[in-house]
Regions:
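Ribosome-associated RNA-binding proteins
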Residues: 1-131
Length: 131
């Protein structure tokens, strides 16, 4: 069974974009390839209790086990060491990505008190969005 957002995108949104912008086929239009969730731990990354609880939280949110990210360089001003834990990340693709986005847009974001929408300033020059 396909996720609801995926069906809406392929049956309604893509054909509308094709007609609006005059694309020769529907695959010339924009589409979402992946969603990456990142959680920075800062200096607490080496504390195993904090790391484990954050790992469990991110796994509950996404349904996938997160990957531990490490610092690439040592920076004295930030008191970081090369190879020490800096955070966690999860990459979602295909059906899990659409299910996550559907829950985020339709359930999680509307529950935020005084939510006024997402800012359009979150886009970079490559089409990525960060909030």
């Amino acid at each position: 069974m396909n996720p609801r957002l995926k069906e809406i995108f392929y049956k309604e949104i893509q054909p509308a974009l094709k007609n609006q912008f005059g694309f020769k086929n529907i695959y010339m239009g924009p589409r979402i390839v992946k969603v990456i969730l990142n959680m920075g731990l800062g200096l607490d990354g080496n504390d195993s209790k904090i790391l484990k609880s954050c790992e469990e939280d991110l796994a509950k949110i996404t349904g996938q086990k997160p990957v531990i990210t490490k610092f690439k360089k040592s920076v004295a001003n930030f008191k970081t060491r090369k190879g020490s834990n800096s955070g966690l990340k999860v990459t979602l693709r295909k059906d899990k990505m659409y299910e996550f986005l559907d829950r985020l847009v339709n359930i999680a974001l509307p529950r935020i008190k005084d939510f006024r929408g997402l800012s359009s300033n979150g886009f970079d020059k490559f089409g990525n969005y960060t909030f």
